[in-house]
Design a protein with these regions (language model features):
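Multi-pass alpha-helical membrane architecture of UbiA-family
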Residues: 1-185
Length: 185
């Protein structure tokens, strides 16, 4: 369930890209092919869009897995097999770390995969933004998650911090791209 939500939301960047690029490239934007021959195919959406979509999938999955920590006992009573209810909080913490490292790496690769000199401007803002938000998310999902297990009030504080951190991640990354695009124009 957690991975499904992440994958569904990962379609948003791909859908936006198709909507924008279909005006200029037509069916090639959907097929992802820049040439009409099978020899020497270039996928227009790879690697930048691929890494952005994968990053979104892992980022949202990491958030949702941690958000499910709040309902572990209810999930177990009702037979819902969320990741934390099925595998426990220790495995949830390990998965959260792996997912956060995964989305950070995907977003870093997206920033490093530019095809033109114009995209080289992503380095000054995109890479530090990804690293900063990856570190902040890791901090929340590790040290703050451990503190949340003592009481329901602590769990509520953790959930609020988790939500704000995850939301802020999106805004910081969007702002770094917007500022970069503004510098280019």
């Amino acid at each position: 369930c957690h991975f499904w939500i992440g994958l569904c939301l990962a379609l948003a960047p791909a859908g936006a890209w198709v909507a924008i690029s279909a005006d200029t490239t037509g069916w090639e934007s959907i097929l992802g092919v820049e040439s009409n021959t099978w020899i020497g195919r270039d996928f227009a959406w790879f690697p930048e869009l691929f890494f952005i979509s994968m990053g979104v999938a892992l980022w949202i999955t990491a958030f949702d897995v941690n958000y499910a920590r709040m309902d572990v006992e209810v999930d177990r009573r009702q037979g819902i097999r969320s990741f934390p209810a099925t595998f426990g909080l220790k495995m949830t913490k390990g998965l959260s770390i792996a997912l956060t490292l995964g989305w950070s790496i995907c977003f870093l690769f997206a920033g490093l995969s530019g095809h033109t000199n114009v995209r080289d401007y992503n380095y000054p803002l995109w890479i530090p933004s990804v690293i900063l938000m990856g570190i902040v998310n890791l901090y929340v999902m590790t040290s703050q998650a451990s503190k949340s297990e003592s009481s329901s009030l602590d769990m509520e504080k953790f959930q609020q911090l988790l939500f704000k951190t995850s939301m802020m991640t999106g805004w910081v990354l969007l702002a770094s791209l917007s500022f970069t695009e503004g510098m280019i124009d």
